[in-house]
Regions:
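Transmembrane-helix signature of 12-pass secondary carriers
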Residues: 2-473
Length: 473
């Protein structure tokens, strides 16, 4: 898998078998991230076709895009608690089934509200995957490479996004349009959603091959099983000390509860930091590119075919930047990457705001010159790169490791739920802002949030590089 190519160097060679096994387990968990990205982006190429097929209003069409995010918030909120009660593996199995049901049902839907129900089911799966994959990976990975392995979640997400863009482009191209008949005489947009069934089945099959999280097993008082798994994950000279450390940590903690994240009726400061990181990750507007990319670039003056091709370019840049982040996150740390990313996003979003303002005609329609169009493309993809090398993967890394064992499950679920609520807000408001004020207003707002994110990280985020999960306070 891609993960093996990313992690080929020194660390794999030193403890070859255990390291490869760790990478394998992390890669399987990250398939949930792939489906997360795929399910989120597949609708990008079908928005116009759905509106025509269901004869829905612009508002209903917009809600059909954003509705998944409501399911995401619910799935993220409950996944951590379920994982603490039932285990990480059963929740991943349930997630795979939900992805499959959503993929099949979305393509079979005959009306907009039926379609929304299946998108909500997909949202439950995406929300759960956003919590359980980084949790599982952080609990099996040695601290020396935990950042890189945890970054596989974001790498898988962006590969999923690019895969959806490519599949949409190929299917729409072969059919002559997303609303045109494709295989078996069925509309192309249906096959876009059905294509997700393939990775869903792969995820389901691979989960059956992996063990439960050893840290969960220790909490469940199943130490012999945990020792057996840890023996395959760790070098012999650190096995006993790691088990002792986990045992001591488990003995000092109570069963995770959502009220544990409160002290004196107030949410713990560290949980607020996690929530704020999640919100800022969305408020810089990245998912406007991935949910409305084709609409955005057509508004900027590009044709439909070119807009879909730009989506593919955006997905490719996203993958490259995530690979760069994986190579850097354990070398220079989490906080420096976030600061650099915030600065880069503020600059590039500001450039886009200026370009959209200058190219707006008297009638409110954007008419870019060839020079402005090139500059907009460059600025947009530099923005995607800045996000992908920082806030994309690093927030997931931090959420997986910044909380201590006592509150980890509840805290991650709370932060991830906040992320999906923020995502929903951005997704729903973009068409409204676009219609009422134009692209320059939307991107001006995202620029402001990028600037604020820089100062937030500088003041409130602590470095977690090189620390054991049991050391987190």
């Amino acid at each position: 898998m891609v993960a093996l190519l990313v992690l080929w160097y020194d660390d794999i060679m030193k403890n070859h078998q255990s390291m490869l096994y760790t990478v394998f387990l992390s890669s399987v968990a990250a398939i949930g991230g792939f489906l997360f990205g795929y399910d989120s982006a597949v609708i990008n190429g079908a928005v116009a076709a759905l509106q025509g097929a269901f004869h829905s209003s612009a508002t209903a069409s917009g809600f059909s895009v954003a509705s998944m995010l409501l399911g995401c918030a619910v799935g993220a909120f409950f996944a951590g608690n379920l994982a603490d009660r039932l285990g990480r593996k059963p929740v991943m199995l349930l997630t795979a089934v939900l992805f499959l049901v959503s993929a099949l049902g979305s393509g079979l839907a005959t009306g907009v509200w039926e379609f929304i129900v299946y998108r909500l089911i997909g949202g439950l799966a995406v929300g759960a995957a956003s919590v359980i994959a980084p949790t599982y990976i952080s609990e099996i990975a040695p601290e020396k490479i935990r950042g890189r392995l945890a970054s596989l979640q974001q790498l898988a997400i962006v590969i999923g996004i690019l895969s959806a863009f490519l599949v949409n482009y190929v299917i729409a191209g072969a059919a002559g349009g997303s609303s045109m008949p494709f295989l078996l005489g069925l509309a192309a947009w249906k096959w876009m959603f059905w294509s997700e069934a393939v990775p869903s089945l792969l995820f389901l099959g691979f989960i059956l091959l992996i063990p439960e999280s050893p840290r969960y097993l220790m909490v469940a008082k199943r130490e012999p099983e945990a020792r057996k798994i840890l023996a395959r994950l760790l070098a012999p000279d650190v096995l006993d000390s790691t088990i002792t450390q986990i045992r001591e940590s488990v003995m000092q903690e109570r069963k995770p509860r959502y009220r544990d994240i409160f002290v004196g009726g107030r949410i713990l400061p560290v949980v607020w930091v996690g929530i704020s990181l999640s919100v800022f990750q969305q408020f810089v507007g990245i998912n406007v590119v991935f949910y409305y990319g084709s609409v955005l670039w057509q508004t900027a003056g590009f044709g439909e075919s070119k807009a879909l091709l730009i989506n593919v370019l955006s997905g490719t840049v996203n993958i490259v930047s995530t690979l760069v982040a994986i190579s850097l996150v354990d070398r220079i740390g989490r906080k420096p990457l976030l600061l650099a990313g915030s600065a880069g996003m503020a600059i590039t979003l500001g450039m886009l705001t200026v370009l959209f303002t200058l190219s707006k005609g008297a009638d409110g329609v954007i008419a870019m010159s060839s020079t402005q169009a090139v500059l907009a493309l460059v600025a947009a993809h530099l923005y995607i790169f800045c996000f992908g090398v920082s806030w994309g993967p690093v927030v997931w890394v931090l959420l997986g490791e910044m909380f201590n064992n006592r509150i980890r499950g509840a805290a991650i679920s709370t932060a991830a739920s906040a992320q999906w609520v923020a995502n929903f807000a951005i997704t729903m408001t973009f068409p409204i802002i676009l219609t009422a004020f134009g692209l320059f207003a939307a991107y001006g707002l995202y620029t402001l949030f990028a600037v604020l994110s820089f100062f937030f990280v500088a003041m409130f985020v602590k470095e977690t590089k090189g620390k054991r999960l049991e050391e987190m306070e």
